[in-house]
Amino acid sequence: MIWTPDLDSLSKIFSGLVENPSLASFPRRIILSPCRRDSMKDTAELFASLDALKARLDAHCPLSPDVVSQIREDMRIRFTYHSNAIEGNTLTMSETKAVLADGITIGGKSLREHLEAVGHSHAIDYLEALVQRDEALTERTLKEIHNLILRNIDGANAGTYRRMNVLISGAGHIPPPAERVPERMDAFFQWYGAARDRMHPVEFAARVHAGFVNILHPFKDGNGRTARLIMNFELMRAGFPTVIVPVDARPDYYRNLDIAATQGDYLPFVMQIAELAQKSFAPYWALLGE
């Protein structure tokens, strides 16, 4: 049985307060088990480690223009490559760099794959501008992020909520019907405004991602890329480096997202993102000689 929550329950799901009734007492048993208590302790230690890493990086601020430029270029290429590769884009890392940095057309690769790389890069530019202006995520900015990803690929659906029902291939849950998407998005933004200051920034960013792509899936296409972008938007606003989900982590990534959607258990996904966030400081240490 697939559980579709009402709007009141939806808001509680995002804060991790509702158990999936189709799974009886399964979530409660996990929460009260010694293993779960150990996992929560591990999460707290991860967050403390991330805060220490951020403080260490903040001590070097302001970073030199050369360091900032190199970090931005490296992040743009790696983030675009991995995020698109997760969705099936076959451009390699070096080909992605050639497209973005040099404007080169890669033989044997489709026009769509080139446009996906360029669109994702433009979306990163937009996120950086939002952060500079200290803007929060809104329905308008969310739709513009999606528009930048798809406007040269599927203009009719870019930046527009889906008008059709969809399935997520291989997932154990079904996104809401198209007619419910606008009200579900209203509930999402209500939760977003209320929850942001009640969680560690990395946990909040991970939950924004999981809730958006799993419970909502509001667009016909491009939901995964949009989710990874808005997750990183929240990390950037909080002063953390960009978290890149590597394509070789895709099986765990999808499995943890599905656990969050079907069991209401966000911990595995939050842990995965927190561990990747630890690794995201490495390019800074390399350039700073630490």
Which ranges hold each PLM region?
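FIC/Doc superfamily catalytic core
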Residues: 3-290
